[in-house]
Curated annotation (Swiss-Prot):
EC top class named in words: transferase
Localization: Cytoplasm
General function of this protein: Specifically methylates the cytosine at position 1962 (m5C1962) of 23S rRNA.
Keywords, in A-Z order: Cytoplasm, Methyltransferase, RNA-binding, rRNA processing, S-adenosyl-L-methionine, Transferase
Domain PUA: 2-79
Enzyme Commission numbers on file: 2.1.1.191
A GO cellular component annotation in the UniProt record: cytoplasm
Protein's UniProt name: Ribosomal RNA large subunit methyltransferase I
SUPFAM superfamilies, sorted: PUA domain-like, S-adenosyl-L-methionine-dependent methyltransferases
Reaction(s) the record says it catalyses: cytidine(1962) in 23S rRNA + S-adenosyl-L-methionine = 5-methylcytidine(1962) in 23S rRNA + S-adenosyl-L-homocysteine + H(+)
Length: 396
């Protein structure tokens, strides 16, 4: 008989709307003794069935729902169906843009909570962030090896969120032979070097693909400051689009070395590109004090808020950095600014940038609102999947 999780009265509403998380404070009692990652059934207080998911005893999110179909068993066939559906959902995008790098599985938004899979040419990189994902690792690897026989499979489950599940970090080769790093992917006709072993996240920020192309529309014959540049891909797009000068800024010398490589693999001269290993906050203040200005500035910082307690501090950080960036823009210049925190509402982010403009004594116009690329879908019942917010603002 299935292990059963009964909810407290009134706590079934989010599951009836198909939100895939059950928090610990919503649970009334547990019938049975589930092991970490084991499949459990969730029922309302009156006993009616709600969903079937994975048990995470050490997490605040104690059940992550695999399915809302009572007839659907959680077995090898279930994961095969989910993986096939995820690939079908990307096929149009791959054909249209000629992609060799894309997000294959976007966790909850693809009905596979805790599972992220990115494809970089013939390397699949898995990030397993929950006990349920961890339990089904071997099955996932078998299925991926069958569906993608030419691909190596590498794991990058080395993120802090695993600690909340009581899991240790895991990295390493799961299947096949890993090619020499970096691997080269292509998007929008541009080649990009990706190191799946040492790179951020699974190796690269695939979610900014569309925004890199949008940024390129504003840069011809312009001076571009690319902040938190990582491997320099906003700058790479700018170089191809005819920017007059580009400054790529990051604290990582390894990232900047890859930024140089990206120019080389695309056959682009970097005579007009400056690579600056520096702290962005300090550098922007320095440039303001020196009276230095730019035509286009890209702000793509790391996440400022990992939890709600950090949100107020994140708001101050976003306001400060956007204020200084706006002070560095020439009249008519363009700021592309981003927040990758799922806790930051899009409207609040826009208000922060508007307030930053007031403090900077600049008049701005919001000319585009940006989000993550379409291979990072947002489930209709999972608003948390909308994490990347961006704005394009023109300053006068």
């Amino acid at each position: 008989m299935a292990i059963r999780i009964k909810l407290k009265p009134g706590r079934e509403k989010s599951l009836e709307r198909r939100h895939p998380w059950v928090f610990s404070n919503a649970i009334h009692n547990i019938k049975g003794k589930p092991e970490a990652g084991e499949t459990v059934d969730v029922v309302a207080h009156d006993g009616h069935w709600l969903g079937r998911g994975a048990w995470s005893p050490e997490s605040q999110i104690q059940v992550r729902i695999w399915t809302f179909d009572r007839e659907e068993e959680i077995d090898r066939a279930f994961f095969a169906r989910r993986l096939q559906r995820a690939q079908i959902g990307r096929n149009d995008l791959i054909r249209e843009q000629g992609l060799t790098g894309y997000r294959l599985v976007a966790a909850e938004s693809d009905g596979l909570p805790g599972i992220t899979i990115d494809r970089y040419a013939n390397v699949l990189v898995c990030q397993l962030l929950s006990t349920g994902a961890d339990l089904w690792r071997d099955t996932l690897v078998e299925l991926l090896a069958e569906q993608y026989p030419d691909c190596a499979i590498y794991e990058r489950s080395d993120v802090d969120s695993r600690k909340k599940e009581g899991l240790l970090p895991v990295t390493g080769l799961l299947h096949g032979t890993l090619p020499e790093m970096p691997v080269i992917i292509e998007e929008n006709g541009i080649k990009i070097a990706v190191d799946v072993i040492k790179g951020h996240k699974t190796g690269f920020y695939l979610d900014q693909r569309d925004n890199r192309a949008i940024a390129a529309r504003f840069v011809k014959d312009k001076s571009v400051l690319n902040c938190f540049c990582y491997t320099g891909t906003f700058g790479l797009y700018a170089a191809k689009a005819g920017a007059a000068s580009i400054e790529n800024v990051d604290v990582s010398s390894l990232a900047l070395a890859t930024a140089r490589l990206n120019m080389q693999v695309n056959g682009l001269s970097d005579d007009n590109v400056h690579y600056n290993e520096a702290d962005v906050f300090k550098l922007l203040r320095q440039y303001r004090d020196e009276g230095k200005t730019f035509d286009v500035i890209v702000l793509d910082p790391p996440k400022f808020a990992d939890n709600k307690a950090q949100l107020n501090g994140a708001c101050r950080g976003y306001k400060d950095i956007n204020m200084i960036a706006l002070q560095l823009l020439n009249p008519g210049g363009v700021l592309l600014t981003f927040s990758c925190s799922g806790l930051m509402p899009a409207d609040l982010f826009q208000k922060i940038v508007a307030d930053a403009a007031l403090d900077a004594k600049r008049e701005i116009q919001f000319i585009e609102r940006l989000s993550q690329a379409s291979d990072h879908p947002i489930g209709s019942a999972f608003p948390e999947g909308f994490y990347l917010k961006g704005l394009v603002a023109r300053a006068w």
